[in-house]
Amino acid sequence: MIDIGELLRAYRKGYFPMSDPSDGKLYWCQPYNRAIIPMESYRPSRDVRRLLRRNDFRVRFNTDFEGVIRACAAPRPNAVETWISESIIESYLELNRLGIAHSVESWYGDELAGGLYGLAIGGAFFGESMFYRRSYASRIAFDRLVMHLRKRGYLLLDAQIMNPHLQKLGAVDIPHKAYMQMLDAALHKKIPFL
């Protein structure tokens, strides 16, 4: 398990952990460009809006954090390796018990159909990973997260490293210096997640 104090200090300084799938070694990452979701300009896609109207999924917070993080860590069809090691899982389970790590879950009946997890510190939410078992389930969870963070007054939704999926969700890359300024402002807020 990663030392919880060290983990929280790292996030406050703009770092996040990833483990190497080949040997399990932990690395602290601080990319030069940081992917963030500009919450004020976020708009759900037409498909997500349609699914929200149909009400096929129920979104819950923190009812199955372990189920979400383990689903995120599971091998995916297009990638056999994962950066989410058992050490990272145990650390985030402890952060969840402490009320710092949270899951946003899309339920389809009694099935955990998709979701995401991350950390809430001050006015910043650090999104870690998402998964889905039914089409659009993770996007529904993501949409509800953005709406929740907006309503609570969060200043930063950190998506860490840009990828095509995050781009579809509206993520943009910003330089390290701009990210650190946003992070500093967000960390000075005291906003409960729930």
Curated annotation (Swiss-Prot):
Q: What is a biological process (GO) this protein takes part in?
A: protein catabolic process
Q: Which Pfam families match?
A: Leu_Phe_trans
E.C. numbers = 2.3.2.6
- Judging by the UniProt lineage, the source's domain of life is Bacteria
Keywords carried by this UniProt record: Acyltransferase, Cytoplasm, Transferase
Q: What InterPro entries does the record point to?
A: Acyl_CoA_acyltransferase, Leu/Phe-tRNA_Trfase, Leu/Phe-tRNA_Trfase_C
The entry's localization annotation reads: Cytoplasm
**Catalyzed reaction equations:** N-terminal L-lysyl-[protein] + L-leucyl-tRNA(Leu) = N-terminal L-leucyl-L-lysyl-[protein] + tRNA(Leu) + H(+); N-terminal L-arginyl-[protein] + L-leucyl-tRNA(Leu) = N-terminal L-leucyl-L-arginyl-[protein] + tRNA(Leu) + H(+); L-phenylalanyl-tRNA(Phe) + an N-terminal L-alpha-aminoacyl-[protein] = an N-terminal L-phenylalanyl-L-alpha-aminoacyl-[protein] + tRNA(Phe)
Principal subcellular localization: cytoplasm
Can you tell me which residues the record assigns to a coiled coil? none
One GO MF term: leucyl-tRNA--protein transferase activity
GO cellular component annotations of the record: cytoplasm
Query: So what family is this one in?
Result: Belongs to the L/F-transferase family.
User: What does the UniProt function comment say about this protein?
Assistant: Functions in the N-end rule pathway of protein degradation where it conjugates Leu, Phe and, less efficiently, Met from aminoacyl-tRNAs to the N-termini of proteins containing an N-terminal arginine or lysine.
Family matches, as HAMAP family: Leu_Phe_trans
Name by which UniProt lists this protein: Leucyl/phenylalanyl-tRNA--protein transferase
What is the species of this protein?
Answer: Chlorobium limicola (strain DSM 245 / NBRC 103803 / 6330)
* Gene that encodes it: aat
